[in-house]
């Protein structure tokens, strides 16, 4: 298909999107036919890692369609889906079509429906359609036209290398597709490779088990590493018909680099196997330097961008998750806008984010939110914007701000400005409460207490979340002031700037030791981590009085890094110790203040942990965790190799 998985993902209890097409060229004189093949999509089946979310919106897919035909004489006809004139057939070749589990296709059933797309097809044996009653929790929705780009094929990859049998005598053969991306296989099977009625199994993996003792002792070295797919089966099954067969699933997608084919009489030649790479976006950026490792890093960034921008921005394209995590999206939205034109894509998803926000403007930790609900209850599902904290929530401000600054387009600001005000006002009205060195819990209204439970998630060294979270609070005030000016709300803008100035003063008072310029937490304990300096420097929160010492300390946390991280791995100079909150701020916080030598050394480091370490290990995408794989410890099992 030219467009995949329409009408895409939204928060279906509030928004049902549709796609429009000009079908003039398809209409012919006399009878015409109109039909559709339905898959689970994001409506039914497995949609998250929570078992309770299976069939979250409904337990069967349905079609809502309308065609308006305007004739040259000024008259018109309207054709709609109804429960009388349409028919359906549920014993076709597609036996299972799950985004997470894969597609099961029986080609022997094609003959029974041959010609079904033609107007003269006899559907008298088919079943008359009936209306599917929407669960009451999802019956009050707004029907809207999508304005983002549909998922589509962005390129087709060939096999890089045929790796032979998984294990001798297994009858399973592995092929390396060259890069870890999102897509589906296209497999041509000549008739001499399998008999009609036989089933071919296709499995997928991001990576193979290496020849480390941990894996050779278990005999799994060289096999697909699928444990990080968790409960997602990620397997396609194809039942052969007569003659040459071509299998290309189009109601699922997988995140993978390697495929394993089982069930053929002999190894399939590599030129019989292709990969259709899928994304909502076409990458438009190019990067080339004298350092081949950084060139590959940029290619990896591009792969992870396109792989995770499939209808919504996801955390991973392969396992039982693939959810619109707000923290991940917030962190990467600005960078992603350099890789591709993300404006319409992000604007569309922000509709879902707003639908999941409560009155405070706080977003969910992922959107759609999949809030637990009672099937028997009459109330609409409550959206209270629960998440891990400001690193996740602040997307309601930062994404509209960054996309406006990148494009100059106002729609995304106008769409979100009321929610931005609600969120920033909520932060400002929730005073910081902390435990001081005496064990008391005073409050300070100059800073916010709405910082959450996680901040610099997945860092190698922890940093106080209240301190970092309040930097993001100040940044939200700054950005909200700019956006208020953009929409002509000058009084609001001035109010936010005054609040930000007060918050900056308080932040420096609370979190900087005036004698050493080192950062500290609310108890007065010295932090002195890369994150504790990078984030406040990036967002210009450090006062002029503290700046010189803070820069010296920040530079030292990189150039003189030492010790061990929480995994017992050594920390060496010019390597990273940061996580969600601060990693994206490291280089800006150096280059903005003239520390360019340190910035280049940090960027080009190949030691663990660094941006280039995964590249030296053969990565073709961005790993979720610094310790996704190390030579010393092997794989971290709960890990996406494409985030």
Residue ranges and their predicted role:
Residues 1-319, 327-328, 344-347, 364-368, ...:
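Extracellular/oxidizing-compartment recognition motifs
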Residues 42, 324-643:
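Active-site core of glycosidic bond-cleaving carbohydrate-active enzymes
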């Amino acid at each position: 298909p030219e467009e995949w998985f329409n009408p895409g993902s939204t928060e279906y209890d509030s928004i049902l999107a549709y796609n429009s097409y000009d079908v003039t060229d398809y209409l012919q004189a006399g009878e015409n036919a109109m039909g559709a093949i339905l898959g689970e999509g994001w409506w039914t089946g497995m949609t998250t890692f929570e078992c309770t979310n299976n069939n979250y919106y409904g337990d069967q897919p349905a079609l809502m369609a309308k065609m308006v035909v305007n004739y040259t004489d000024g008259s018109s006809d309207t054709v709609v889906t109804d429960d009388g004139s349409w028919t359906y057939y549920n014993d076709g070749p597609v036996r299972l079509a799950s985004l997470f589990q894969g597609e099961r296709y029986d080609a022997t059933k094609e003959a029974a429906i041959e010609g079904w797309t033609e107007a003269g097809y006899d559907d008298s044996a088919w079943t008359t359609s009936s209306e599917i009653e929407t669960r009451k929790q999802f019956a009050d929705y707004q029907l809207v036209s999508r304005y983002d780009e549909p998922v589509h094929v962005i390129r087709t990859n060939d096999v890089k290398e045929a790796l032979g049998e998984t294990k001798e005598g297994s009858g399973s053969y592995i092929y390396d597709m060259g890069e870890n991306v999102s897509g589906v296989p296209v497999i041509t099977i000549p008739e001499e490779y399998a008999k009609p009625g036989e089933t071919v199994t296709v499995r997928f993996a991001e990576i193979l088990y290496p020849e480390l003792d941990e894996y050779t002792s278990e005999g799994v070295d060289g096999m697909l590493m699928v444990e990080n797919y968790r409960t997602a089966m990620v397997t396609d099954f194809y039942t052969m018909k007569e003659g040459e067969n071509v299998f290309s699933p189009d109601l699922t997608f997988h995140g993978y680099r390697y495929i394993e084919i089982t069930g053929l009489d002999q190894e399939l030649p590599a030129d019989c196997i292709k990969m259709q790479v899928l994304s909502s976006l076409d990458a438009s950026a190019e990067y080339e330097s004298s350092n081949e490792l950084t060139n590959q890093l940029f290619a990896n960034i591009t792969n992870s961008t396109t792989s995770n921008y499939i209808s919504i921005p996801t955390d991973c394209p392969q396992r039982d998750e693939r959810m619109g995590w707000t923290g991940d999206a917030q962190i990467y939205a600005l960078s992603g806008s350099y890789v591709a034109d993300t404006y319409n894509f992000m604007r569309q998803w922000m509709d879902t984010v707003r639908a999941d926000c409560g009155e405070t403007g706080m977003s969910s930790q992922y959107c759609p939110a999949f809030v637990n609900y009672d099937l028997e209850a009459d109330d609409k599902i409550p959206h209270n914007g629960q998440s891990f904290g400001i690193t996740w929530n602040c997307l309601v401000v930062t994404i509209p701000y960054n996309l406006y600054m990148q494009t100059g387009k106002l729609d995304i600001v106008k769409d979100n400005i009321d929610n931005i005000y609600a969120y920033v006002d909520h932060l400002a009205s929730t005073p910081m409460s902390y435990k001081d060195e005496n064990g008391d819990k005073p409050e300070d209204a100059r800073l916010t207490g709405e910082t959450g439970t996680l901040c610099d998630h997945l860092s190698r060294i922890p940093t106080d979340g209240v301190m970092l979270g309040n930097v993001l609070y100040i940044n939200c005030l700054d950005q909200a002031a700019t956006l208020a000016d953009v929409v002509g709300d000058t009084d609001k803008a001035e109010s936010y700037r005054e609040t930000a100035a007060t918050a900056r003063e308080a932040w420096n008072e609370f979190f900087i030791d005036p004698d050493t310029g080192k950062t500290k937490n609310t108890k007065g304990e010295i932090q002195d981590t890369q994150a504790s300096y990078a984030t406040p420097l990036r967002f210009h929160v450090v006062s002029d009085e503290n700046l010189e010492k803070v820069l010296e300390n920040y530079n030292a946390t990189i150039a003189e890094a030492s010790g061990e991280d929480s995994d017992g791995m050594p920390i060496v100079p010019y390597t990273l110790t940061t996580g969600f909150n601060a990693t994206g701020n490291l280089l800006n916080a150096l280059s903005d203040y003239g520390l360019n030598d340190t910035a280049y050394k940090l960027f080009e480091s190949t030691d663990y942990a660094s941006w280039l370490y995964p590249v030296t290990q053969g990565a073709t995408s961005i790993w979720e965790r610094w310790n996704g794989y190390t030579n010393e410890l092997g794989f971290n099992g709960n890990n996406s190799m494409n985030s």
